[in-house]
Design a protein with these regions (language model features):
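Conserved alpha/beta enzyme-core scaffold
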Residues: 1-220
Length: 220
């Protein structure tokens, strides 16, 4: 099955009120072309964004933030994003700040169909507010619920037409786990090859998790 689609077809899967996962961290592995297409070619809004850092200065995600397109942001690090800091301080956006390890495990648990993550991280801090707790062998843990998206934008170096992906180095980051934790997964790839041209040992994300592929650099 050939899963290659246009950017126009890809962004049509995001609607007003969607829960959108975006892979990458601090410019590494960011599917910026998909986000920019969503920003410039649609008017969707009230999106809940699940992203490690919600973009850096002048990134497509930050530009969407400044346009007020996100209703809520769930992430781990907002220190490099002045726009989200501004909106949080103004009270014009909902946000959930999650410890980075917990963030990844919550996504992984969604992909595995689990009911959540049990972790000591955040006990006794603001992170624990409003969350269910459990005591195991005299130690207190938080029960963190899974994080799942309706649509995920991820990025790969190489994809084959069936959706097998190759990711390189630290660009793997959250892209790998988000591929397993969304209802519809779209990969932006720098190169697309015929099915069978990627050595199975080189596959980072198998095609079973990928619903669509777009080629980076193509016009919308």
């Amino acid at each position: 099955m050939n899963k290659v689609i246009s950017k126009k077809e890809a962004i049509a899967h995001v609607h007003d009120g969607s829960v959108l996962m975006v892979g990458g961290f601090n410019t590494s592995g960011d599917p910026n072309e998909l986000v920019e297409a969503l920003r410039t070619k649609t008017s969707v809004k009230n999106i809940t964004l699940i992203s490690t850092d919600s973009g850096v200065t002048d990134s497509p995600l930050t530009n969407m933030l400044s346009e007020g397109r996100f209703k809520k942001v769930i992430g781990t690090f907002f220190g490099a994003n002045k726009e989200i800091q501004k909106r949080v301080n103004e009270g014009t956006i909902e946000y959930e700040l999650v410890p980075q390890g917990t963030f990844v495990e919550r996504i992984r648990s969604a992909g595995a169909g689990l009911g959540g993550v049990i972790t000591p991280t955040g006990v006794g801090t603001v992170v624990a507010e409003g969350k269910q707790k459990i005591n195991i062998d005299g130690r207190e843990y938080l029960i963190e619920k899974p994080l799942r998206g309706e649509v995920a934008f991820i990025r790969a170096e190489i994809a084959d037409e069936s959706g097998n992906l190759v990711m390189i180095g630290n660009a793997k980051n959250t892209n790998t786990v988000m591929a397993m934790a969304a209802d519809f997964v779209i990969a932006q790839a720098n190169q697309i090859v015929k099915t069978g041209e990627i050595d199975p040992d080189d596959v980072t994300v198998p095609s079973i998790y990928v619903d669509a592929i777009v080629l980076a650099g193509e016009e919308i």
